[in-house]
């Protein structure tokens, strides 16, 4: 089986090499065309520090923690172009193949994780999937897209506010992965109607989507214990049971958004939708059918979100300003005395407490000249300030993450904020891109990601360092011992 996967990957790689980076298109008559593109990517990541705290397994600095191989192939076919009498109709297909090799030929510690839990790890380390598959219909003010797809309604990067429709895959790199690369496409029907110009509002558009819950829901995967990017925690002492949402209409993802441009500058949107939390909620259950009569149940809960976003260009400052606000109705939280009363001598099954949460972001994007470091290209800067506020805060509220070494739960503050900054520029006619990304938590943690990317068409090479410093019980600092250096090679065709 291992040899088969290696052979498949090498075969795809050689196919891409023979294509020499060129997309190809096949025309069908005068109206349609078919285009096939893709990429093959391999990444190796090495841990730069020793394992600390509850991180398992123990891995010394310099050891490999990731060897991810990814291949995608996309097909886009335009069947008809829009005319006065005919609609535009096209479809899109994308296949994705993923294989993580660290469990097969990585450090012994990760090979031992696989041997201890072969069924779970063997299923986790590879994926062959019809990643995207949808059809588009466009006629006048109407647009419909039906199929497996991504949908993003937010203005934010790095962290999500309104952009929580699709589940995220945090198991193959966690916070070190780009947000766009973590979204998991889901089956949905999506429609838009453009009302045109109404008063001072232009391009007033109503949009809605529905991801049916009675047909089975896609949820954010849960990282197995011992995987490189799982949150640090002591080994489980009771059975852990993961429960996906029931197949009911009530568990559908669905929402509506209205957006438009005011005075030809202010892009404004209002939205409301229901989605499924990416992190399952934990309760301790008293169950006589399991050994010891105690189990930990993890359940994916639904949440409704109401929010707004706006962006506009300020000519005097040559800057784009962005803002977004979201109200999360009855979001699950973790209060040990309620979720896990058995830990306090009260042997009854726990419950999931909920509260409303306000989250917002203010940011700006600016391009400027700094000729001291770059005479030919501008510097790109993207700044964001994030904040969240728990309205019905309980002083007992915690994060479901254990603090080392005694295992008490980490504090969840009523008000928390973070700053993000991304700066980049280009050299060598746009083929060399250095970038620095920062995430700062005022409570005492900093994540910094310097990287450099060079393209030699059809190849793209990237070298990045993922560093974390500060307190190990504060947001990004929880993964403080996961610092790594990564090298990635991508072949596009």
Q: Model segments located where?
A:
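Residues that define the transmembrane beta-barrel architecture of outer-membrane proteins
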Residues: 32, 46, 63-71, 126-131, ...
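Outer-membrane beta-barrel "beta-signal"
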Residues: 479-493
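Short loop/turn motifs that connect adjacent beta-strands in outer-membrane beta-barrel proteins
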Residues: 24-36, 76-91, 138-141, 145, ...
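Transmembrane beta-strands of outer-membrane beta-barrel pores
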Residues: 42-48, 95-101, 139-141, 150-152, ...
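Detector for outer-membrane/organellar transmembrane beta-barrel domains
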Residues: 82, 86, 273-275, 322-332, ...
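Residues on the lipid-exposed face of transmembrane beta-strands in outer-membrane beta-barrel proteins
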Residues: 71-77, 93, 132-137, 189-193, ...
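Transmembrane beta-strand segments of Gram-negative outer membrane beta-barrel proteins
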Residues: 27-55, 89-97, 101
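Outer membrane beta-barrel
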Residues: 83-227, 466-471
